[in-house]
Amino acid sequence: MILVYTGDGKGKTSACTGQTVRAMGQGMKVAFGQFMKRDGQAGEQTMLAQWLGPRFLAGGLGFLRRDEERPAHREAALRVLDWAREQLLEVDMLVLDESLYALGAGILLRGEVEDLLARARQQDKHLVL
């Protein structure tokens, strides 16, 4: 199953967090990665870190503000992407919060996201973007 949360405004991270709680309540193993938020930036991070331990990663540098920040953001996104590929082998559901923002900003490449989609399908995993 692939779930997509997108659009302007609030609620996407809350929806992803809700899906995480639902899945954990059903006994599923979940990993939750954030592409843009840095560690300690948002309130949900404390609980997700407690619940998920190493299966939670806030690997971003904050939201992209200037073009000259793009290379550092790209490097951080690649670290989250590598982590996500590893997690996909171990979990039932992988949540990749802000992945579509990173894609739209050119920090992630379309082929990289398509590769994750293909891997999730092949492994019969739940993927939340």
Per-region residue spans from a language model:
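Conserved P-loop
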Residues: I2-L89
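Phosphate-binding/switch loop-helix module in NTP-utilizing enzymes
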Residues: R66-R121
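A short helix->loop->beta-strand "cap" motif at the edges of active sites that frequently abuts
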Residues: M28, Q122-K125
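Residue-level preference for the first positions of well-ordered beta-strands
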Residues: M1-V4, D92-M93, H126-V128
